[in-house]
Regions:
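C-terminal helical cap(s) of enzyme catalytic domains, especially alpha/beta-barrels
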Residues: 282-300
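Hydrophobic faces of well-ordered beta-strands that scaffold small-molecule active sites
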Residues: 23-28, 51-53, 78-83, 117-119, ...
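Acidic/histidine-rich catalytic cores of soluble enzymes
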Residues: 81, 147-247, 252, 261, ...
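Active-site acidic/histidine proton-transfer and metal-coordination neighborhood
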Residues: 14-17, 73, 92-193
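Conserved, mostly hydrophobic/aromatic
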Residues: 43, 51, 71, 81, ...
Length: 301
């Protein structure tokens, strides 16, 4: 059985006339140096001008300074501090510990001039910390994650870094509209958007019409987007729906639209490749992105 081709829709946004700026591309460094300045140079050698934050503790002031200065010296922006834990863990002690971990993560992001600290909003699943649960789409979930976002931001009071919740296919925010509603409910300038369109593709309609999905995200969330993920999605045909992540260019995501819209955002928003298995897959994915970028008149340099 063959999967029909993806529909590429026209955007209502004036993409052709909008000014475009170079996109900062980033990804992980395999076997990277522990020295921040050397690690930043390794990023540049790979063609990257954005990076994931190196490991660092909040109380290690010297390393925080070295990361901030070493990456800035080499014009490499730290896109995100990822703190991956369940802010809605059923165990009160673990939930409190996880909340503090994200507070520390946002404080680290502020110290190293990262664009954001990112985590999923959480899950009520008792067995898998990021897993599906019926209540992950409920008002109870929405209210709890809004309260957590306020607590985290109010504890740090960042002036530059944003707190973001990663989009998910089975937990809020699971759409542009639910993210926009969350932004309004949190009501803090330091709450931003981390765009991961592949995570939103959870049904055939979104898979086939991912161009429209991308345009909706940029149209509705553009002013708040501070960092983005790059991966691709393929439909493996089975007796039920099964989408799998694949290297860029091997799936269905409309990167012509993604790159065009990203290059016209008002901010300098990094695009971070993720979830690939080897340095070779990242290099091939970067090659694909640069080819598409050239076709649509977008630069990474």
């Amino acid at each position: 059985m063959a999967v029909p081709s993806v529909i590429v829709a026209e955007s209502s946004a004036p993409q052709a006339s909008a000014p475009r700026h170079p996109i900062r591309l980033g990804g992980p460094i395999f076997g990277g140096s522990s020295d921040p300045e050397e690690l930043a140079r390794q990023h540049r050698a790979e063609g990257y001008r954005a990076a994931y934050c190196p490991g660092v503790k909040l109380d290690d002031r010297e390393r925080l300074r070295a990361i901030r200065e070493g990456f800035a010296k080499n014009d490499v922006v730290i896109a995100e501090v990822g703190v991956w834990c369940n802010l809605l863990d059923a165990r009160p002690d673990v939930r409190a510990q996880n909340l503090q971990r994200v507070i520390d993560g946002l404080a680290i992001a502020e110290e190293v001039n990262a664009r954001c600290c990112v985590n999923i909003a959480g899950s009520f699943n008792p067995d898998v910390w990021f897993g599906p649960h019926p209540k992950n789409l409920s008002e109870e979930f929405f209210d709890a994650v809004v309260e957590n976002a306020r607590k985290i931001i109010d504890a740090v009071k960042p002036k530059r870094a944003k707190l973001c919740y990663e989009m998910m296919g089975w937990a809020l925010p699971d759409s542009a509209d639910s993210y926009l509603r969350m932004i309004k409910a949190v009501d803090r300038d330091a709450f931003g958007v981390h765009l991961d369109p592949c995570n939103l593709i959870n049904c055939p309609e979104r898979f086939y019409n991912n161009t429209a999905l991308l345009n909706e995200c940029f149209d509705k969330l553009g002013p708040w987007i501070v960092s983005c993920h790059a991966k691709d999605l393929k439909w493996e045909v089975e007796m039920n729906i099964h989408f799998v992540e694949v290297p860029l260019g091997q799936g269905a995501l409309d990167y012509r639209t993604y790159l065009t819209r990203l290059a016209t955002l008002p901010g300098d928003v990094p695009l971070m490749m993720e979830h690939m298995r080897s340095a070779e897959e990242y290099r091939n994915s970067q090659k694909y992105l640069r080819q598409v970028a050239q076709e649509v008149g977008v630069s990474f340099d």
